[in-house]
Amino acid sequence: MHLSGIPYEAAEILTDKAKMKDAFRQGGVSAADGMRVRSAEEAQKAAEQLGYPVVVKRVDSSGSRGITVVEHSGQIEEAYENARNGSARDYVLVEKFLRGTEIGVDGFVQNHKLVFLAPHTKFVYRGAHTTVPVGHAFPYGCSGALREEIARQMQLAVTASGADQCSVNADVFVDGEKVW
């Protein structure tokens, strides 16, 4: 039918946080260090290697479902089980916890190029095991240099994932002029 839209391969990458992390690492996108694990024991080893605090993530959910910030080893098993429950995958992601401010970035991609970018402040409600966005504020107030770095990182992510002919929505951490 030759309809335009996101390529299947890009959708596969962008709907699995571990595959996305692999693609981003290969594409030079700034991201938290992390490891794919298949057991609570592997999660424990990954957390020790990365250093606490870490984030244990379900790889195939959105809305922060299946995501737990882990401060010490006594929390790993429960965090691993929380991430595995409800997942179609046999692995989860353990990442180094990033400090900074979480913002949202929306945009449009045409011919593999980010043609519109709208970084914004996010307002969220945080429950026990989920985060729900309740509002956004546009434009995001930042320096020109930071806006350029956000755009650069987003273009790297678009290129690394193969996203094309689509809208994009990303959660980005900002600390000073650093973007993840």
Specify the residue positions occupied by each region the protein language model found.
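Short amphipathic alpha-helical segments
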Residues: M1, T68, G107
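A short alpha-helix capping/helix-coil boundary motif
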Residues: M1-H2, D22-A23, V132-G135
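Phosphate-binding core of ATP-grasp and ATP-grasp-like enzymes
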Residues: A83-Y91, L98-Y140, E148-W180
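Active-site nucleotide/adenylate-binding loops and adjacent lid/helix of ATP-dependent enzymes
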Residues: I13-L93, R99, Q110-N111, Y140-R152, ...
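N-terminal glycine-rich "phosphate-gripper" loop used for MgATP/nucleotide binding
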Residues: M1, A10-L14
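Short beta-strands and strand-loop turn motifs
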Residues: H2-I6, K57-V59
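Residue-level signal for pocket-adjacent positions within structured domains
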Residues: I6-E9, S30-A32, S62-R65, L93, ...
